[in-house]
Swiss-Prot record:
SMART domains on file: EFh
Protein source organism: Mus musculus
Binding site for Ca(2+) 3: 159, 161, 163, 165, 170
Any Pfam family the entry gives: EF-hand_1
Domain EF-hand: 24-59, 60-95, 96-131, 146-181
Name of this protein: Hippocalcin-like protein 4
Keywords recorded for this protein, A-Z: Calcium, Lipoprotein, Metal-binding, Myristate, Repeat
CDD domains in the cross-refs: EFh
Domain of life: Eukaryota
UniProt function note: May be involved in the calcium-dependent regulation of rhodopsin phosphorylation.
Miscellaneous notes: Probably binds two or three calcium ions.
GO terms of molecular function: calcium channel regulator activity; calcium ion binding; protein domain specific binding
InterPro entries: EF-hand-dom_pair (IPR011992), EF_Hand_1_Ca_BS (IPR018247), EF_hand_dom (IPR002048), Recoverin (IPR028846)
Residues anchoring lipid (N-myristoyl glycine): 2
């Protein structure tokens, strides 16, 4: 992006103020930082993975970053622009519990069919285990569950109709009624 795009267009800024939890000033700061890190104005998967690697240096964050990238990339074009980035950041950092659950569901629903299968859940849980690294996982995972055991425990609590799939409704209902499920989904057993 050249000098023409170094500032957010007023209509884009207004749209983001209306559709995120950030103020106009915060959006301008985030945009400035985004352009500093991504002069082209877009992030590709490899660049996104490098950001995750910086935050999780003790494990392998590449697989989890791939899933987060897919969830951030709303239009499916293989890149994340500022709008996609800031909207996802708004939900994950300042969104309501309901918004965060919807976002998490999207991440776990790998094929986007509106249902989470055991294999989809296992894929994400394994990616979380790899991302945080063995030493940290041992401290966090005080119950000693393997990824498969964690998936089984989550499905036992969430899959109300026992069809081996979790719908968005089941996901939200279980998370609201039992906060420990959210901890299981995050693989964070510290209370």
């Amino acid at each position: 992006m050249g000098k023409n795009n170094s500032k957010l267009a007023p209509e884009v800024l207004e749209d983001l103020v209306q559709n995120t939890e950030f103020s106009e000033q915060e959006l301008k700061q985030w945009y400035k930082g985004f352009l500093k890190d991504c002069p082209s104005g877009i992030l590709n998967l490899e660049e996104f993975q490098q950001l995750y690697i910086k935050f999780f240096p003790y494990g392998d964050a590449s697989k989890f970053a791939q899933h987060a990238f897919r969830t951030f990339d709303k239009n499916g074009d293989g890149t994340i622009d500022f709008r996609e980035f800031i909207c996802a950041l708004s939900v994950t950092s300042r969104g309501s519990f309901e918004q965060k659950l919807n976002w998490a569901f999207e991440m776990y629903d790998l094929d986007g069919d509106g249902r989470i299968t055991r294999l989809e859940m296992l894929e994400i849980i394994e990616a979380i285990y790899k991302m945080v690294g063995t030493v940290i996982m041992m401290r966090m995972n005080q119950d000693g569950l393997t990824p498969q055991q964690r998936v089984d425990k989550i499905f036992k609590k969430m899959d109300q109709d026992k069809d081996d799939q979790i719908t968005l409704e089941e996901f939200k209902e279980a998370a609201k009624s039992d906060p420990s499920i959210v901890l299981l989904l995050q693989c964070d057993m510290q209370k």
